[in-house]
């Protein structure tokens, strides 16, 4: 392949994730994005809890029951001359750690906001994570077919609370039962709303020009007059779109629509392929890697078990940072210093797998993993370096785990270590007893772990409360002082799933006192993989 052909392939890639508060419509919009990208023929109406139609992107058993995205799926589809990689992130508020890590693998994010509710808690947290890397953000104001808040008010709230300038690209005409469509500020066109449920994409009627009398006929004179006045205010008060400000994460283009009614999603996708960046450079511990480089590099940001119920396998999700992947390629796993031949990499369509012949910078590929790959692993064509910025977050909730059948201790430990390697939960083994303590960022993770232990490892476990309120990874350059610290605090020390030493504190007061007592010891809230 010539350098110009390779450059063309990379330039076509757009890799993004959707962030939102639970129930803002993220899973529905994921479905409709795939529908407009022709990736699925039927957008299964999401979350008819208990219905036989399940969203294509929610496919683990527990997700099917609850109607929430617990795992991170990857979907690739063509749109507008580009190849789009969509990383679906857990929408439920308990799954932040997995979601955080997924955000390290994308070049752009789509923020979905329920226009009736505005900025919600989960959105704030996820925006903080995107801020760590100044990720560009597009915004979709959803649920226009319901009664919503004043759109100007919601934009002000986004600007104030999320510290990002808003630039409306489309603007709604009416809402709820009076929702008539949206006007595109830069194309001077009105798209009239016709609801399209499920997998039908309606032919949209377009009225050209803001002062076209056809608009008055289509939406009614009163509404048309009111809309034109509103638009004057909007154009005077809002920011013009600035591509550089978007790329630096300082400004977000805003689109309006209703994902459930299949309306407005294509306008947002048009903006995404036109403005979102092609694969971006990434930092390693030795240098910056740019997508145009000829040699293959990539990093693992997620490991998922049980993607195929018939085979108890695990798949490592790898983001290609540079170069071209080809079937049968020999790659170096930097952490283990081993060369491996990758003959059966996968590409995904949420649970449907197909074997992959090639992939380029920006793509996500799946590697079969029999316990040898960990989150944060870097793969190269020989160069020794490690991609940085793929963190573990200190858990906030803890439980002691006990077996119903004491003879299954070995299976329990194996299951917990594997689940911790894929980031589903963190495991701590205290140095002074045989307890197993699991730590999570949200309550639902405990449920996921117990149901997976049962279905994948045939282990029935129960949780008990434990006197731990927080954990920190500890390290120290002074060997003598570290030994003294370990000797005097042994009762509060534990090893995590990767055998890293951790301090498990019964209270925040205890942690603060210990930190003051041992200033030379570093207590870390996050740990690089």
Curated annotation (Swiss-Prot):
<dbReference type="Pfam" id="PF16658">
    <property type="entry name" value="RF3_C"/>
</dbReference>
<dbReference type="InterPro" id="IPR038467">
    <property type="entry name" value="RF3_dom_3_sf"/>
</dbReference>
<dbReference type="InterPro" id="IPR004548">
    <property type="entry name" value="PrfC"/>
</dbReference>
<feature type="binding site">
    <location>
        <begin position="88"/>
        <end position="92"/>
    </location>
    <ligand>
        <name>GTP</name>
    </ligand>
</feature>
<dbReference type="GO" id="GO:0003924">
    <property type="term" value="F:GTPase activity"/>
</dbReference>
<dbReference type="InterPro" id="IPR041732">
    <property type="entry name" value="RF3_GTP-bd"/>
</dbReference>
<dbReference type="GO" id="GO:0006449">
    <property type="term" value="P:regulation of translational termination"/>
</dbReference>
<dbReference type="InterPro" id="IPR053905">
    <property type="entry name" value="EF-G-like_DII"/>
</dbReference>
<comment type="function">
    <text>Increases the formation of ribosomal termination complexes and stimulates activities of RF-1 and RF-2. It binds guanine nucleotides and has strong preference for UGA stop codons. It may interact directly with the ribosome. The stimulation of RF-1 and RF-2 is significantly reduced by GTP and GDP, but not by GMP.</text>
</comment>
<dbReference type="InterPro" id="IPR031157">
    <property type="entry name" value="G_TR_CS"/>
</dbReference>
<feature type="domain" description="tr-type G">
    <location>
        <begin position="11"/>
        <end position="280"/>
    </location>
</feature>
<dbReference type="InterPro" id="IPR032090">
    <property type="entry name" value="RF3_C"/>
</dbReference>
<dbReference type="GO" id="GO:0005525">
    <property type="term" value="F:GTP binding"/>
</dbReference>
<feature type="binding site">
    <location>
        <begin position="142"/>
        <end position="145"/>
    </location>
    <ligand>
        <name>GTP</name>
    </ligand>
</feature>
<dbReference type="Pfam" id="PF00009">
    <property type="entry name" value="GTP_EFTU"/>
</dbReference>
<dbReference type="InterPro" id="IPR035647">
    <property type="entry name" value="EFG_III/V"/>
</dbReference>
<dbReference type="InterPro" id="IPR027417">
    <property type="entry name" value="P-loop_NTPase"/>
</dbReference>
<dbReference type="GO" id="GO:0005829">
    <property type="term" value="C:cytosol"/>
</dbReference>
<dbReference type="InterPro" id="IPR009000">
    <property type="entry name" value="Transl_B-barrel_sf"/>
</dbReference>
<dbReference type="GO" id="GO:0016149">
    <property type="term" value="F:translation release factor activity, codon specific"/>
</dbReference>
<keyword id="KW-0342">GTP-binding</keyword>
<dbReference type="InterPro" id="IPR000795">
    <property type="entry name" value="T_Tr_GTP-bd_dom"/>
</dbReference>
<keyword id="KW-0963">Cytoplasm</keyword>
<feature type="binding site">
    <location>
        <begin position="20"/>
        <end position="27"/>
    </location>
    <ligand>
        <name>GTP</name>
    </ligand>
</feature>
<dbReference type="Pfam" id="PF22042">
    <property type="entry name" value="EF-G_D2"/>
</dbReference>
<protein>
    <recommendedName>
        <fullName>Peptide chain release factor 3</fullName>
    </recommendedName>
</protein>
<comment type="similarity">
    <text>Belongs to the TRAFAC class translation factor GTPase superfamily. Classic translation factor GTPase family. PrfC subfamily.</text>
</comment>
<dbReference type="InterPro" id="IPR005225">
    <property type="entry name" value="Small_GTP-bd"/>
</dbReference>
<keyword id="KW-0648">Protein biosynthesis</keyword>
<keyword id="KW-0547">Nucleotide-binding</keyword>
<dbReference type="GO" id="GO:0016150">
    <property type="term" value="F:translation release factor activity, codon nonspecific"/>
</dbReference>
<dbReference type="GO" id="GO:0097216">
    <property type="term" value="F:guanosine tetraphosphate binding"/>
</dbReference>
């Amino acid at each position: 392949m010539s350098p110009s052909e390779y450059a063309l392939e990379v330039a076509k890639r757009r890799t993004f994730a959707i962030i939102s508060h639970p129930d803002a419509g993220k899973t529905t919009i994921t479905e409709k994005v795939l529908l407009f990208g022709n990736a699925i023929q039927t957008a299964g109406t999401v979350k008819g809890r208990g219905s036989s139609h399940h969203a294509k992107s929610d496919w683990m058993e527990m997700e099917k029951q609850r109607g929430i995205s617990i795992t991170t799926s990857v979907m690739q589809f063509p749109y507008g001359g580009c190849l789009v990689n969509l990383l679906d992130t857990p929408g439920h508020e308990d799954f932040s750690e997995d979601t955080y890590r997924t955000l390290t693998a994308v070049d752009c994010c789509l923020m979905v906001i329920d226009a009736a509710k505005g900025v919600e808690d989960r959105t704030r947290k996820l925006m903080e994570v995107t801020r760590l890397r100044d990720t560009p953000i597009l915004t979709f104001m959803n649920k226009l077919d319901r009664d919503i808040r004043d759109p100007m008010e919601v934009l002000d709230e986004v600007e104030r609370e999320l510290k990002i300038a808003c630039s409306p690209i489309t603007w709604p005409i009416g809402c709820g039962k009076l929702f008539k469509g949206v006007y595109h500020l830069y194309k001077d066109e009105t798209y009239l709303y016709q609801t399209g449920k499920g997998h039908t994409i309606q032919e949209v009627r377009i009225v050209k020009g803001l002062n076209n009398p056809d608009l008055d006929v289509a939406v009614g004179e009163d509404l048309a007059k009111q809309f034109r006045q509103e638009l004057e205010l909007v154009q005077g008060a809002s920011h013009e779109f600035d591509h550089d400000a978007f790329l630096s994460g300082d400004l977000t283009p805003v689109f309006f629509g209703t994902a459930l009614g299949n309306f407005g999603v294509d306008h947002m996708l048009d903006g995404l392929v036109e403005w979102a960046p092609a694969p971006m450079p990434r930092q390693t511990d030795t240098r910056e890697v740019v997508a145009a480089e000829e040699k293959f590099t990539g990093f693992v940001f997620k490991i998922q078990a049980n993607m195929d119920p018939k085979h108890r396998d695990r798949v490592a999700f790898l983001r290609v940072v540079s170069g071209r992947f080809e079937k049968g390629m020999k790659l170096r796993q930097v952490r283990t210093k081993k060369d491996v031949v990758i003959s059966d990499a996968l590409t995904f369509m949420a649970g449907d797998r197909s074997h992959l012949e090639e992939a380029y910078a920006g793509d996500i590929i799946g590697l079969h993993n029999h316990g040898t790959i960990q989150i944060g692993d870097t793969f190269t064509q020989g160069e020794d370096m490690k991609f940085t910025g793929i963190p573990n977050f200190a858990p906030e909730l803890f439980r002691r785990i006990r077996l119903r059948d004491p003879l299954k201790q070995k299976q329990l430990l194996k299951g917990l270590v594997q689940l911790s390697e894929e980031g589903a939960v963190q495991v701590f083994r205290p140095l002074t007893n045989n307890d197993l303590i699991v730590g999570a960022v949200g309550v639902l993770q405990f449920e996921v772990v117990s149901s997976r232990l049962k279905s994948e490892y045939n282990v029935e476990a129960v949780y008990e409360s434990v006197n731990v309120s927080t954990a920190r990874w500890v390290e120290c350059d002074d060997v003598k002082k570290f030994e003294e610290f370990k000797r005097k605090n042994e009762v509060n020390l534990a090893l995590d799933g990767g055998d890293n030493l951790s301090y498990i504190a019964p209270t925040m007061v205890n942690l603060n006192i210990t930190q003051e007592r041992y200033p030379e010891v570093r207590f870390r809230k996050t740990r690089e993989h």
